Amino acid sequence: MNPVRKRRLFIVLAILAGVGAAVALALSALQQNINLFYTPSQIAAGEAPEGARIRAGGLVEKGSLQRDATSLAATFRVTDGVATVTVRYQGILPDLFREGQGIVALGRVDAGGMLQADEVLAKHDENYMPPEVSQALEKSGMLKHYENGKPGGAQ
């Protein structure tokens, strides 16, 4: 092989190796930031991987909120109308967090099936519901019940 071809081959191989390394790094970074959404039914059925960071959403069950008097810890139940999962959160709950409202919690499922949340997101007005929560409630038939019971909903 003549020197010019050898040099071109080396350059092409170096470029391919660089592109391959860049793609591998990008995929690795994206994989670490993926938070899959699970409904309470899926978590209760054991579909959510234990210890993996997930998003879970549904309606906060009325009467389920318990706050620790000595810390910022809060425990509450989230339902999709079919199943319920207990969520434990250490921190200040959002101002719009209420029982009977839709939320999305980010965290990890422990061995007991409880979601240990490190972030809780509440809907930002009475008409908005996160798309994942809305779809989960629609599948379970609870969306109409929620809309009929909320302020401004059909009575």
UniProtKB/Swiss-Prot annotation:
Cytoplasmic topological segments: 1-8
Transmembrane portions of the chain: 9-29
Record topological domains on the Periplasmic side: 30-155
The UniProt record lists the keyword Transmembrane helix: yes
Subcellular location(s) per record: Cell inner membrane
Pfam family, one: CcmE
Chief location category: membrane
An example molecular function term from Gene Ontology annotations: metal ion binding
UniProt keyword annotations, A-Z: Cell inner membrane, Cell membrane, Cytochrome c-type biogenesis, Heme, Iron, Membrane, Metal-binding, Signal-anchor, Transmembrane, Transmembrane helix
A GO-annotated cellular component: plasma membrane
Source organism superkingdom: Bacteria
InterPro entries in alphabetical order: CcmE (IPR004329), CcmE-like_sf (IPR036127), NA-bd_OB-fold (IPR012340)
Binding site for heme: 124, 128
Membrane-protein topology: Single-pass type II membrane protein
GO process annotations (BP): cytochrome complex assembly
Family, as annotated: Belongs to the CcmE/CycJ family.
Described function: Heme chaperone required for the biogenesis of c-type cytochromes. Transiently binds heme delivered by CcmC and transfers the heme to apo-cytochromes in a process facilitated by CcmF and CcmH.
PANTHER family in UniProt: CYTOCHROME C-TYPE BIOGENESIS PROTEIN CCME HOMOLOG, MITOCHONDRIAL
Designated name of the protein: Cytochrome c-type biogenesis protein CcmE
Organism: Azotobacter vinelandii (strain DJ / ATCC BAA-1303)
Gene transcribed to yield this protein: ccmE
